[in-house]
Each structure stands twice: as structure tokens, then as C-alpha cells.
Amino acid sequence: MDIEEFVERSIGCWRSQRSGHSLALSHFEEVRSTIDIVDLPKTDHEVKNLCDSSGVDIENAVSPFKMSWEGESDWDENEIIKGSCVLVPIPEDDNLKKGKLLRSQGYAETVSAVGEYYITEDDTFVLYTEYESAAAEEKIWFHTSNLRFRVSLIKTSDGNGVLTASFSSEIRS
């Protein structure tokens, strides 16, 4: 699998159940959400703006997409967790199995971010993103075309300590 196939397989509406452990707060959280992933053309203004602000030539972009989510947590049942971000893969030297991933909003911090991705021999998508005060590592793999799993770690900025760990199962709806 390469990044184009990974994005193509991800397009759609997913129901997600995530269990997360905050090691810093000794807290467990369960989040149920709906995730919508849609492909975007390179001509989309958000794609262009993200490439421009990241100093990346839009011609190097492949398979841009937008991810939107809405869910609720058992930690605060009155709060709706909601957001969206544009993501633009930039393969490394025509190697679609590794490169950079531009994000209009990061996973660990709500600022734009540039992560490094690669796809393993067993078709696991791995993304590592460094932020100012933390680092995020995400792994996503498909068990079937309608079932995927995601593991996420938020680490200290030096990468040695783990702040949060989560596991998600996502079913295409």
C-alpha cells in the first residue's frame, strides 16, 4: 500500500470508539465519535493555503483530504468534541510510501503541523509529528475495508516520556 491507496481506503464516514489513558493525570477516557473523511482537489483553496504556508510546491502534493469529527467523551458528557482539518501528503522523491504530511490542525496541539509518515511492509501507516511542547506518534491499519484500528501516543517534546496513549477501533458507516 502507498499513501494514495491509504487515503482512498480512508475516504468515507467512520464511527470511532477510542479509549485513552492520560498517564500524566492518571485518568481513563472513552470517546465515541463520527469521523468524515473526504478527498479534496489540489485546486481547493484550503489545500493551496496550507501548501503555501508550509513552503511546499502544490505540484508535489498527492491525495489531499479533509477530516471532520464530532463526538462525546465520558469525561465531560456535556461537551461536544468537534473539529476539522485539511491534510496534504507530500511524498519523498516520488516514493509514495514515505514523506511529509501537512496538517492545518495538529493532533497534539491545535496549530498547523508538518509530520513525517511512512507505510510499513504490513501496510501500517505511521505518522510522527513534533510540536513545540510535545510529539505525537500515530499508527493506523486496516483489518478489512470497513474496519481500521488506530494507536496514538502523545510524548514529551524530547520523545522519551509518554503523556497519553489511546486505541481506537473505527467502523465504516
UniProtKB/Swiss-Prot annotation:
Keywords: Lyase. One of its GO terms (molecular function) is lyase activity. Transmembrane segments: none annotated. Covalently attaches a chromophore to Cys residue(s) of phycobiliproteins. It holds the Pfam family CpeS. It comes from the Bacteria. Its EC number is 4.-.-.-. HAMAP family: Chrphore_lyase_CpxS (MF_01459). CDD domains: lipocalin_CpcS-CpeS. This is Chromophore lyase CpcS/CpeS 3. It comes from Trichodesmium erythraeum (strain IMS101). Belongs to the CpcS/CpeS biliprotein lyase family.
